[in-house]
Amino acid sequence: MNRAPLKRSRILHMALTGASDPSAEAEANGEKPFLLRALQIALVVSLYWVTSISMVFLNKYLLDSPSLRLDTPIFVTFYQCLVTTLLCKGLSALAACCPGAVDFPSLRLDLRVARSVLPLSVVFIGMITFNNLCLKYVGVAFYNVGRSLTTVFNVLLSYLLLKQTTSFYALLTCGIIIGGFWLGVDQEGAEGTLSWLGTVFGVLASLCVSLNAIYTTKVLPAVDGSIWRLTFYNNVNACILFLPLLLLLGELQALRDFAQLGSAHFWGMMTLGGLFGFAIGYVTGLQIKFTSPLTHNVSGTAKACAQTVLAVLYYEETKSFLWWTSNMMVLGGSSAYTWVRGWEMKKTPEEPSPKDSEKSAMGV
């Protein structure tokens, strides 16, 4: 199916607001029977949930396990980027050998393209590093609350960069999210489990997630619109930029002193973490392809709720009513924002006027 190219301003608008591309939805749905589409969607959503939740728990083990006692969060992140880079290169080579069996773009390291992707790579490094640092210092149960301000930053950046105002109802949902965030911080403090450092890392991770959406749309033309090429260059740049950080923060010395450095179990878990890091990008794309960005947001919110409950049960934690209320406020506010934006998209035309397009381009 031939698809008309999207303007950069429209792509950026979709990235920040969660709008869907009608042609993409039509292509994803096609003419398949309803039951087949429903089964595909159920399988893809389940795969996303299992991959995402497993990755969070595994990263928590690698970053803050009492039995592992490994205090090298930057190295863990670096290794996951290295695994992703090798997987991309391996799949590219496999696709060249078996073009009919494996569908993957050819990858060749071009320094000019790497330089073009560099601004995004810096944001990408911030996103994955702050994510892991947040997870290191806060519990899995509080992790979603600690990183709950992504929607708020999306609204803020939409105004600052796209000059796009947000409706009263959407702002109201953001207020609910912020209220839930502060109530969660208050309750973590009341229970004596609050880590201000982890909370700050969570806020920074939320900011980087929003910035990542902006820079992704700006950089995609440099890699011919290929998400896999962008993933490859992002992770190559990240591996290089992480090396001086490992030296400056003394993590290489800490790694040399690590008691389980020669353990096959340790390296197996590290590699599994890298595999999950690679897989989450793939299953996220699958979920958006078979549903829509808005449905993906709803699925992510529901997954966060299930992840919180699983974390409380797994770690045998006891939480207060107000703590649960803070989680429900964050998850409810996020769901309400998704619903409000979807409702507003249906009321207004998808295509902006030429004047709006010029204003959006100038904002970027």
UniProtKB/Swiss-Prot annotation:
One of its GO terms (biological process) is GDP-L-fucose biosynthetic process. GO terms for molecular function: antiporter activity; GDP-fucose transmembrane transporter activity. It comes from the Eukaryota. Keywords: Congenital disorder of glycosylation, Disease variant, Golgi apparatus, Membrane, Sugar transport, Transmembrane, Transmembrane helix, Transport. It is a multi-pass membrane protein. Pfam families: TPT. It is found in: Golgi apparatus membrane. It catalyses: GMP(out) + GDP-beta-L-fucose(in) = GMP(in) + GDP-beta-L-fucose(out). The chain crosses the membrane at residues 34-56, 76-98, 111-130, 140-162, 167-185, 195-214, 227-249, 264-286. GO terms for cellular component: Golgi apparatus; Golgi membrane. InterPro entries: Sugar_P_trans_dom (IPR004853), TPT_transporter (IPR050186). Antiporter specific for GDP-l-fucose and depending on the concomitant reverse transport of GMP. Involved in GDP-fucose import from the cytoplasm into the Golgi lumen. Belongs to the TPT transporter family. SLC35C subfamily. It is linked to Congenital disorder of glycosylation 2C: A multisystem disorder caused by a defect in glycoprotein biosynthesis and characterized by under-glycosylated serum glycoproteins. Congenital disorders of glycosylation result in a wide variety of clinical features, such as defects in the nervous system development, psychomotor retardation, dysmorphic features, hypotonia, coagulation disorders, and immunodeficiency. The broad spectrum of features reflects the critical role of N-glycoproteins during embryonic development, differentiation, and maintenance of cell functions. This is GDP-fucose transporter 1.
